[in-house]
Amino acid sequence: ATLSSHNFISETVWLAHKESLLAYYIAEADIFLATKGDEIIGFIALINLEVPALFVAPKYQNLGIGSRLLLYVKFICIHLWLRVYKKNKNAIHFYQNHGFLIIDSCIDPLTGEEQFVMDWKNRPLMN
């Protein structure tokens, strides 16, 4: 899912850092899985209030699985933030539909690509 949703980044970049990223997520993140039988079809990672990763297997995308994973962490957290590549228009739209706002931008040192910093707070419906 990483390669298909980030096709603007060279596959060699992901492959070069795959092991270190996996080790980091396993050591630092709470990881919540979406499964179908024994198959993992998606996951969301949570490190404190950051969502560093949300992926759904390509054949299971657009079925609400990513939304359910995100809604779960929104249920257990009052505030979340994440970074998303500026070129990943589908992800930006997805997060905006879930109440995230773009609050800043930065350059990812791993890829050299611009990212938006997005923020979500459990805001009351009425003031």
Residue positions per predicted region:
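Conserved catalytic-core motifs of GNAT/GCN5-like acyltransferases
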Residues: 83-85, 101-117
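Conserved acetyl-CoA-binding loop-helix of GNAT-fold acetyltransferases
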Residues: 62-75, 93-97
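Conserved GNAT acetyl-CoA-binding A-motif
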Residues: 75-87
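Conserved beta-hairpin
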Residues: 28-42
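A short, internal acetyl-CoA/4′-phosphopantetheine-binding micro-motif in the GNAT/acyltransferase core
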Residues: 47-61, 84-85
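Conserved GNAT-fold acetyl-CoA-binding loop/helix
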Residues: 1-22
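Terminal substrate-recognition subdomain of acyl/acetyltransferases
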Residues: 116-127
